[in-house]
Amino acid sequence: MYAGGVKGLKNTVKALKKDAKIIIVTVGLADVYDQENIDNIRKSINKQVPQNILNNATIFHLRGGIDHKKLNLKHRTMMALLYNKVKHLPENKKTAEIKAMIETYNQKVDFIDYDALNQIIKVINQKSLFAQ
């Protein structure tokens, strides 16, 4: 996930056939087992993908990591602006995702679970998913 969307997804789906079967994998810092986070990710995908393609999509959400010290100036600035905006929100307005961002700001965090790739591999290996 990048700035609330799946980077490049909107342009990618424009090139697909109307009945294309696709796998969408999101990777972000948000807890992928938190229903509110899942709902927010799905809303973002719904804005980027036409319904006819979404109906044939298999969607997975994975957690990634971030090392703030390795971000370029543009992204460090974006993160600083976002952090300064959300840290002053009232507690009842802070989502789990926002709280996690505040807690991990300016740190190196790694939530990567390579075992989570197994479910994606399983779907890819199911020939029926991509049979014409």
Q: What is each residue range found by the language model?
A:
Residues 4-132:
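FMN-binding flavodoxin-like domain, especially the glycine-rich phosphate-binding loop
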